Amino acid sequence: ATVYNQDGTQVNVGGRVEVAL
């Protein structure tokens, strides 16, 4: 389950924020 933010980053269930390439 990954939630994508409007700025193109993604917040994983663990709380880590990653940049969607």
From Swiss-Prot:
Presence of the UniProt keyword Transcription regulation in the record: no
Disulfide bond among keywords: yes
Chief location category: membrane
Keyword vocabulary terms for this entry: Cell outer membrane, Disulfide bond, Ion transport, Membrane, Porin, Transmembrane, Transmembrane beta strand, Transport
Entry GO MF terms: porin activity
Membrane protein topology class: Multi-pass membrane protein
Annotated compartments: Cell outer membrane
A cellular component annotation (GO) from this entry: cell outer membrane
GO biological process, one term: monoatomic ion transport
Function, in words: Structural rigidity of the outer membrane of elementary bodies and porin forming, permitting diffusion of solutes through the intracellular reticulate body membrane.
Protein family membership: Belongs to the Gram-negative porin family.
Subunit text: Disulfide bond interactions within and between MOMP molecules and other components form high molecular-weight oligomers.
Stated name of the protein: Major outer membrane protein
Record organism: Avibacterium avium
